[in-house]
Amino acid sequence: MSSKSGGAKKKAGDGRKIIADNRKARFNYSIGETFEAGIELKGSEVKSLRTGQGSLNEAYAQVTRTGEVMLVNAYIPIYLQANQFNHETRRPRKLLLHKREIEKLAAAVQRQGMTVVPLRMYFTDKGRVKVEIGLAQGKKLADKRETLKERSWERDKARLMREKG
């Protein structure tokens, strides 16, 4: 009957427990196609993520020459109870994708100059950690300003509706 405090942040509508959400990526990039990838983690990393900590800020994914996709610069804090068996906080982690998906990502990055960015990290119903990655094109400064204007207008519109209604 007791619930654990400090766990994963929130539960999405489809039963996912979201660990980390990269909100800056949606602002700085226009996201095209998205993929769901598994991630190769050590035990202490999974334990640390279960506490709801972790960050995808400044993280990116890259396709290596050997045909693997690596998640670089994602922050998973150390797990205090793991003491000597702990992990590095910002080590490169392998993302698990199908071969066709990897080829598609590599082609888009090479030919179209796109970037692969992690959008969110979450636990599935089965307790597996997944990372949602997206093919992204960098936004220009004018596009970012337009996004800010739209958000501001939506906020003002909602405020006006509350005052009138």
Swiss-Prot record:
Required for rescue of stalled ribosomes mediated by trans-translation. Binds to transfer-messenger RNA (tmRNA), required for stable association of tmRNA with ribosomes. tmRNA and SmpB together mimic tRNA shape, replacing the anticodon stem-loop with SmpB. tmRNA is encoded by the ssrA gene; the 2 termini fold to resemble tRNA(Ala) and it encodes a 'tag peptide', a short internal open reading frame. During trans-translation Ala-aminoacylated tmRNA acts like a tRNA, entering the A-site of stalled ribosomes, displacing the stalled mRNA. InterPro entries: SmpB, SsrA-bd_prot, SsrA-bd_prot_CS. GO terms for molecular function: RNA binding. CDD domains: SmpB. One of its GO terms (biological process) is trans-translation. The keyword ATP-binding does not apply. Keywords: Cytoplasm, RNA-binding. It is found in: Cytoplasm. GO terms for cellular component: cytosol. This is SsrA-binding protein. HAMAP family: SmpB. It comes from Parvibaculum lavamentivorans (strain DS-1 / DSM 13023 / NCIMB 13966). PANTHER family: SSRA-BINDING PROTEIN, TMRNA-BINDING COMPONENT OF TRANS-TRANSLATION TAGGING COMPLEX. NCBIfam families: PRK05422.1 (NF003843), smpB (TIGR00086). The gene is smpB. Belongs to the SmpB family.
